[in-house]
Amino acid sequence: TIEYPLEAEVRSLYASEYAKGKALVDAMNTYLGGALPDCEAVALALHLVNAGFSTGDLSATYTMTGVIQQMLTVIEGYYGITLDQNSVNVARFITHLRYLFVRIHQHEQLDDEPEPIVESIKTSYPKASDCANKLAIIVKMRLNVSLSEAEIAYLTLHVARVTSHATESHENDDTNA
């Protein structure tokens, strides 16, 4: 049996693709009378993710998965919370991150937001803005790409939203996203 180092992350971050991969493994085992292990669903899920974003590079999908998991860990540590990776809010956040990685890969970051909007987001959500800047550092370190101010502002909104339900009982948190 092959062990996939990102198996837990794939199951959590790409639950839909993993379910499809598992169904494919089950179908192949039924049709071929074989005994492919369930962990092969991880490889199939990663191929589905890769195909869905047309990067053509599975290593980019592995990197994206690791960076997303690292970002979620940073958010949890920064806010002192545990994010429910099965929640709609976390799924929306992960979807945003996946499209961010596509924009990075295509060298097409958001950059057309007027400065007053970017500044308004920063002042409206100072804690989420600080956290988003930490996430931008991860992107810089892991992918060697500096995020634009517009991307960081957009990321700020998503950080505020993903943490809002987990932190709504705490004072002075950014919970209005």
Could you say what each language-model-derived stretch is?
Residues 1-177:
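A cross-family "folded-core" feature that marks the main globular domain of proteins
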